[in-house]
Amino acid sequence: MKKNEEGACFIFHMRQDYVTIINAMAVMAMNLDVMKRVNRAVRVVSGSAKGRPLKSVPGMSTRPTTDKVKEAIFSMIGPYFDGGTVLDLFAGTGGLGIEALSRGMDRAVFIDVEQRSIETIKDNLKAVRLQEAAEVYRNDAARALKVLEKRGAAFDLVFLDPPYKFKNGDELMNDMAERKLLREGAVIVLEYESGYEYPESFGHFHGMRTARYGETAVTIYRYETVQGQAAGADEEESHDDNRE
């Protein structure tokens, strides 16, 4: 009887250990899947630095643009460039500006108010060997535009990817226009919360296309001071892709 009890106890513990091992393996698989998805979301998609991994900002809940959304954006505005200067405002990891450099832009200016973001952008630029083509500054958006105006800067492409609580993207674009920071025909990529609506056109900005990816919306504007230059406006797409 005692031997039977010992045998049953042994089998019970064996089963418990087996269940524990299976659960541990499942957790490891889930963690590995998460790591793979994160890694896919922070790489250069195309161009000279294609496939190079980009660091995320440590300890911050930034929303780096996923590869699918990034590829969709550049398909709408490029996908490649024959020179030009790009401004990555609210730069975060610098992923969008770095992608533009990788795809042919000559110069990039990165602006962010967080020191950790600035350090991450510099690290990412070094990792993809594009630091010589970039300038990185810590400042808030409004002050940064004043500084850029004094320097006589002008841009062909602008990325505006502010926190979702920021609802004044159109005002910021008008400020850039008044400060003559935009070249004729400049393209502005505005990312914002999908539930929010920006005007299709305003001032000298003409909406070329709007696409929605889960919680994120992207509107492409073109800056034109000459009437009749903006074509292909009023297009809108919806997708199920989400940002991180």
What are these model-predicted stretches?
Residues 2-4:
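Polybasic, lysine-rich low-complexity intrinsically disordered segments
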Residues 7-244:
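Class I S-adenosyl-L-methionine-dependent methyltransferase catalytic core
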